Amino acid sequence: MNKVLALLFLVFTSAFAAAKKPNIIYIMTDDQGYGDLACHGHPFIKTPNLDKLHSQNTRFTNYHVSPTCAPTRAALMSGKNAFEAGVTHTILERERMALGLPTVADVLRKAGYTTGIFGKWHLGEQDEYQPHSRGFDEVFIHGCGGIGQRFAGSQGDVPKNNYFHPTIRHNGKFVKTKGFCTDVFFLEALRWMKTQKDKPFFAYIPTNAPHGPFLAPEKYKALYKDHAKGDANQAFFGMITNIDDNVGLLMKKLDEWGLADNTLLIYSTDNGSSKGSRVFNAGMKGGKGSVNEGGSRVPLFMRIPGTTKAGKDLGQLARHIDIFPTLADIAGADLGELKLEGRSLAPLLKDDTTQWLDRTLFFHGGRWPKKGAPGKFGKGDLNLDNYKYKKFAVRTERWRLVGKETLYDIKTDPSEQTNVIDKHPEVAKKLLTEYEAFWKRARPLMVNEDAPLDVEKPFEANYLKQKENGGIPEWKVPSL
């Protein structure tokens, strides 16, 4: 009898603990920079819902990602520096995250979570690289690095796919959707969340917007006719306001469904701004693709009522490699022998006075040419190791070394205007030595450098096969 009672107690307490695990929603936009928010000082952009979320959140104001998108996604998923996860580019097979690396979705699923992705994956097109093979239960994605894109090698989305009414791969089957892409991704994510009552969920919503080509519904572009010149600029800002509306809808539904108080809601972006950095860049140098502050420093908002502090800014140096250990920590997941590069941010969310030691972060633009690649992608120096010292940076709390010859004191010069390398040569030497050790460690792990390009485009091929054999059904717009 006592054994039975003990077993029942164990089952009850385990179920109670599982029920208390917070849901996790991670929203990541594409090519939106730190300055592309009204709450960060932008003079005319309209982001009322994100501004509201900003006021409710703990904000990491010194959070950094990679200069371009696929490397950031690899770091988020693997908890490792992108080069050490095999990702050095956004195309040419170099966007494929190395096989054998456990993902944050794998770890959360083992911790009792159901997992879903809605939007842009961009870490490999072959089935073994796709999210359904990397820990995701629910998959609703476009192909390639952008809707309608195609490049040499395996990357190729559905032919002639468009931001409006895109064809999406849903759990292995393609469907023809109705609506603007960002609206579609959020609606499907919300439909799925609404059905997840028995398990905590991890919903990853990496939007394709505001990545180019710059397209937005007319009502959103119209908001910027008096502020931005040209259709593309108006569309860029309109895409962000459209994202804002969808974040507002998500927040509303979380409240309606009684999920808000037990949901960690995270908002961030994948790299610095593309269009926006030319308009307002929060005083930073550089944008997407740059190894200056404007290429890597992006928003990171985290909200979970009862844990995070509303309106609290945290200036500790943080990076995308910290997201994996943070989510695992909050979910109570067992990492076992898994070694991650990052640190959990969870202690800072609970107590902002927690000791946070200085650290050294490494950045590289990647994107070197490849033998056999067409056009500009195959031109230039084809020796990878000759790019070791090209377009790299090293960051600590105080310093940013950009290349071998430029050192900025970020504490006193956040806009990177004054090179102080002559005053602090010992600092530059130390950072360069650390970078060289990083490159030596990462170089053998760049496993995609010699991958052949004369391969099938599996995402496109699967679409064409389904179209020929049974057709592409229409997606049912969710009723929320």
Task: Show the residue positions of the predicted features.
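Hydrophobic h-region of N-terminal signal peptides that target proteins for export
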Residues: 9-17
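Formylglycine-dependent sulfatase
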Residues: 2, 16-403, 412-433, 437, ...
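A glycine-rich phosphate-binding loop feature that marks nucleotide/adenosyl-phosphate handling sites
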Residues: 450-455
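Sec-dependent signal peptide recognition
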Residues: 1-8
